[in-house]
């Protein structure tokens, strides 16, 4: 709980004023805010093996501290032996306290555990949101390496209220995300 309070406090005391002066906002309501973090795992192999969904839900719940939900297919695709409403993925949407806890864990613990880590790409979506692809779930400390049956990757999307990529980059950089080729201010 103290981590959450520290990140929120850091945003209010240091990050928000820095962004306000950097972009010359006239109102505090214009300052970009991290709205939510969405973690998604696409599990195409779940068509053949139903147990993968249960394992992925348990792992995602352990990583995020919030119950994961199975995503289902919307239509039949015969070539992939896929039927409508079959579970084919797992996702979690984090907001408020859990969002800040997960962000803290991601930046301070998980990302430094990636092999040959040199920073994350700086590709945004044009509206200030950022998606990070992770190859292995074993970088999180909650996952016991001996008990996993399959290495699974995931997408982590940071949804911000930023209007431009530059504002979103500045916000996430202030939160401590280690971008490659970070611009020196």
Curated annotation (Swiss-Prot):
Sorted UniProt keywords: Ribonucleoprotein, Ribosomal protein, RNA-binding, rRNA-binding, tRNA-binding
GO MF terms, alphabetically ordered: rRNA binding; structural constituent of ribosome; tRNA binding
Assigned GO CC terms: ribonucleoprotein complex; ribosome
Family matches, as InterPro entries: Ribosomal_uL5, Ribosomal_uL5_bac-type, Ribosomal_uL5_C, Ribosomal_uL5_dom_sf, Ribosomal_uL5_N
Pfam family of the protein (one): Ribosomal_L5_C
Biological-process GO terms, alphabetical: translation
Xref: HAMAP family: Ribosomal_uL5_B
Similarity comment text for this entry: Belongs to the universal ribosomal protein uL5 family.
PANTHER family: 60S RIBOSOMAL PROTEIN L11-RELATED (PTHR11994)
Protein role: This is one of the proteins that bind and probably mediate the attachment of the 5S RNA into the large ribosomal subunit, where it forms part of the central protuberance. In the 70S ribosome it contacts protein S13 of the 30S subunit (bridge B1b), connecting the 2 subunits; this bridge is implicated in subunit movement. Contacts the P site tRNA; the 5S rRNA and some of its associated proteins might help stabilize positioning of ribosome-bound tRNAs.
Subunit annotation: Part of the 50S ribosomal subunit; part of the 5S rRNA/L5/L18/L25 subcomplex. Contacts the 5S rRNA and the P site tRNA. Forms a bridge to the 30S subunit in the 70S ribosome.
Protein name: Large ribosomal subunit protein uL5
């Amino acid at each position: 709980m103290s981590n959450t309070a520290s990140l929120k406090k850091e945003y209010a005391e240091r990050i928000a004023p820095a962004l306000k002066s950097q972009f010359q906002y006239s109102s505090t309501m214009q300052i970009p805010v991290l709205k939510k973090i969405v973690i998604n795992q696409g599990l195409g192999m779940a068509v053949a093996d139903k147990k993968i969904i249960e394992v992925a839900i348990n792992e995602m719940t352990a990583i995020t501290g919030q119950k994961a939900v199975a995503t289902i297919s919307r239509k039949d695709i015969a070539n992939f032996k896929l039927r409508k409403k079959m579970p084919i993925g797992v996702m979690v949407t984090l907001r408020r306290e859990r969002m800040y806890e997960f962000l803290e864990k991601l930046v301070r613990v998980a990302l430094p555990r990636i092999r040959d880590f040199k920073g994350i790409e700086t590709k945004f979506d044009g509206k200030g949101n950022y998606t990070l692809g992770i190859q292995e779930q074993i970088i999180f400390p909650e996952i016991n390496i001996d008990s996993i049956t399959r290495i699974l990757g995931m997408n982590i999307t940071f949804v911000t209220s930023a209007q431009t990529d530059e504002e979103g980059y500045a916000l996430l950089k202030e939160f401590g995300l280690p971008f490659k080729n970070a611009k020196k201010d």
